[in-house]
């Protein structure tokens, strides 16, 4: 016997009547018939059947533990302590809710305040926002901010920079019409200071990375900052924060703005995201007022107790769009909290040990790679090592994949002048036997 109350279409009929239609077909009558398609969905399956099919598809993926990867070039395999995931999956943190109401968001706001405090200590600058989308967007926002502060219309960056970062920078600066000036590298794979001096005039900001895209530590960071400041430009440093346990903080090297990637702490590679961009400035009212994103501040409530709030909310949801410093609609709060938990767990000693192990593993990788290919640039490498081959690297890479090894990042499509070159990377997770297996495979094919 049919159930006359299923389905119940009364609410649908009421809504159609309210807007002047008799049926769903009438509502969409203006859509050309040729554009209306049948779904042609297959027969439904049980949840278990769907589980089996998806599991079969997912089993085709290989993790970096099953297939050692030397890919690098911006995304790296770091070990994440088990408690990080447990803590960020707590319902107090794992939410899409923006903490607009501080009276019910003290836990999240305090966690983000701790993130800001940790990053401030790490980069050597006192004012930090609660994150950007990623390193690339943070760098692009720094370019726009430099132009606003100095009222100049040129931003100087290294030619040897991630192709993805270049695309993001051009996307951000095309609308405002900010000119991007590129400076080449010298014979050591570092920024050419003489060319920088020629191109810095009229610049709003000068950007440099530590380490640079080739994995090399720029030896003249302080001198680059002096050249920028002598020209009246802001000095912007992009940093991989995992190196900051073993080198001087960029704020102590003269940086006005520091950007970087916080997601290297506490967050998996996950196909490249999500990320959390670091954004820090020195204690200057002009810079603070022009910062993009959110800043979490500590204050006192009506009862005189400590409280955390969002402060200087110069974003488009709070003020007129044209007046906003940035149109970033949200930050990467959960990613930033994960980074803060990991950083707090490491502490100063753990951070130093992390940097030392990465440096040691990179040096071993570089030494072994020099046995089978050319290392065109001298200097100290951190994580990435640029290697040049005589044969086609695309062919070499295919053979490595057959040997269950994921090789380096192919550079020729982005830097043709470097020939058949690639970036190979190591982190604290890179095992000696992985490197040895890579070299044995390269001996046969390179």
UniProtKB/Swiss-Prot annotation:
| Protein family per UniProt | Belongs to the GcvP family. N-terminal subunit subfamily.
Question: What chemistry does it catalyse, as a reaction equation?
Answer: N(6)-[(R)-lipoyl]-L-lysyl-[glycine-cleavage complex H protein] + glycine + H(+) = N(6)-[(R)-S(8)-aminomethyldihydrolipoyl]-L-lysyl-[glycine-cleavage complex H protein] + CO2
Describe, as the record does, how this protein assembles with itself and its partners: The glycine cleavage system is composed of four proteins: P, T, L and H. In this organism, the P 'protein' is a heterodimer of two subunits.
Known role: The glycine cleavage system catalyzes the degradation of glycine. The P protein binds the alpha-amino group of glycine through its pyridoxal phosphate cofactor; CO(2) is released and the remaining methylamine moiety is then transferred to the lipoamide cofactor of the H protein.
- InterPro entries, sorted: GcvPA, GDC-P_N, GDC_P, PyrdxlP-dep_Trfase, PyrdxlP-dep_Trfase_major, PyrdxlP-dep_Trfase_small
Q: Which domain of life is it from?
A: Archaea
Instruction: Tell me yes or no: is Zinc among this UniProt entry's keywords.
Output: no
Name it. Answer: Probable glycine dehydrogenase (decarboxylating) subunit 1
What SUPFAM superfamilies does this protein's entry cite? PLP-dependent transferases
Keyword Mitochondrion recorded: no
């Amino acid at each position: 016997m049919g159930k006359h109350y299923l389905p119940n279409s009364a609410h649908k009929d009421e809504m159609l009547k309210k807007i002047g239609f008799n049926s769903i077909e009438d509502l969409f009558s203006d859509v050309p018939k040729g554009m209306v398609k049948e779904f042609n969905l297959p027969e439904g399956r049980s949840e278990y059947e769907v589980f089996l099919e998806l599991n079969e598809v997912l089993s085709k993926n290989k993790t970096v533990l099953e297939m050692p990867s030397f890919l690098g070039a911006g995304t790296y395999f770091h070990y994440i302590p088990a408690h990080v995931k447990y803590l960020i999956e707590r319902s107090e943190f794992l939410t899409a809710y923006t903490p607009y109401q501080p009276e019910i968001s003290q836990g999240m706001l305090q966690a983000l305040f701790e993130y800001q405090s940790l990053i401030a200590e790490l980069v050597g600058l006192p004012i930090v926002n609660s994150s950007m989308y990623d390193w690339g967007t943070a760098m692009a926002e720094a370019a726009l901010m430099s132009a606003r502060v100095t009222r100049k219309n040129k931003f100087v960056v290294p030619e040897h920079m991630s192709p993805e970062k270049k695309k993001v920078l051009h996307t951000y600066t095309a609308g405002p019409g900010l000119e991007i000036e590129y400076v080449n590298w010298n014979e050591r794979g570092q920024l050419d200071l003489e060319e920088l001096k020629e191109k810095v005039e009229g610049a709003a900001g000068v950007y440099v990375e530590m380490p640079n895209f080739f994995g090399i530590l720029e030896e003249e960071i302080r001198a680059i900052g002096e050249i920028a400041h002598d020209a009246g430009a802001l000095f912007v440093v992009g940093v991989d924060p995992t190196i900051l346990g073993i080198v001087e903080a960029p704020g102590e090297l003269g940086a006005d703005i520091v950007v970087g990637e916080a997601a290297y702490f506490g967050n998996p590679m996950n196909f490249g995201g999500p990320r959390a961009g670091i954004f820090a400035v020195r204690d200057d009212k002009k810079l603070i007022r022009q910062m993009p994103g959110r800043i979490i501040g500590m204050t006192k409530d009506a009862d005189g107790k400590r409280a955390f709030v969002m402060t200087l909310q110069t974003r488009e949801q709070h003020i007129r769009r044209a007046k906003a410093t940035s149109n970033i609609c949200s930050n990467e709060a959960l990613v930033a909290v994960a980074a803060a938990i990991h950083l707090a767990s490491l502490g100063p000693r753990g951070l130093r040990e992390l940097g030392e192990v990465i440096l040691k593993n990179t040096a071993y990788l570089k030494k072994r790679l020099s046995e089978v290919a050319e290392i065109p640039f001298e200097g100290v490498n951190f994580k990435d090592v640029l290697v040049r081959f005589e044969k086609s690297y695309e062919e070499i890479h295919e053979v490595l994949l057959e040997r269950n090894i994921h090789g380096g990042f192919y550079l020729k499509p982005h830097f043709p002048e470097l020939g058949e070159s690639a970036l190979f990377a190591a982190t604290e997770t890179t095992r000696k036997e992985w490197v040895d297996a890579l070299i044995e495979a390269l001996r046969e094919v390179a």
